[in-house]
Amino acid sequence: MQITVEFSGGLETAFDGNKKHVLDVPEGSSVNWLLHHMVETLMPDHKREEGKNIFLQDESVRPGVLVLINDSDWELEGEDQYILQPRDVIIFASTLHGG
């Protein structure tokens, strides 16, 4: 099944600058599965360790990263336990900015 994943607020740099990805994922996959799948398949090898540290902390999304599932805060949807559905749009937006 297909889902769309989008990155903003600088997170796209960990994913080789690509802000939008359309992914085929197995039915029954959770957001937790998706997080690890993205690190392994969307992050370039030479950026994986640094990118993982920007994106994840303790095997979940790092504090300061807003996650929206179909424009709804992921906390309302079960966070990383949410089971992905066909045509879901998952947005990861960093709320931390340097300055």
Swiss-Prot record:
GO MF entry, a single one: protein tag activity
GO BP of this protein: protein urmylation; tRNA thio-modification; tRNA wobble uridine modification
UniProt keyword terms in alphabetical order: Cytoplasm, Isopeptide bond, tRNA processing, Ubl conjugation pathway
InterPro entries: Beta-grasp_dom_sf, Mopterin_synth/thiamin_S_b, Urm1
Modification comment: C-terminal thiocarboxylation occurs in 2 steps, it is first acyl-adenylated (-COAMP) via the hesA/moeB/thiF part of UBA4, then thiocarboxylated (-COSH) via the rhodanese domain of UBA4.
Subcellular localization, as worded in the UniProt entry: Cytoplasm
Keyword check for Repeat: no
Cross-link (Glycyl lysine isopeptide (Gly-Lys) (interchain with K-? in acceptor proteins)): 99
Annotated GO CC locations: cytosol; nucleus
Residue list for modification 1-thioglycine: 99
Top-level taxon in the UniProt lineage: Eukaryota
Broad class of the protein's primary localization: cytoplasm
Coiled coil start-end: none
Protein's pathway: tRNA modification; 5-methoxycarbonylmethyl-2-thiouridine-tRNA biosynthesis
PANTHER family the record matches: RURM1 PROTEIN (PTHR14986)
Protein name: Ubiquitin-related modifier 1
Gene designation per UniProt: URM1
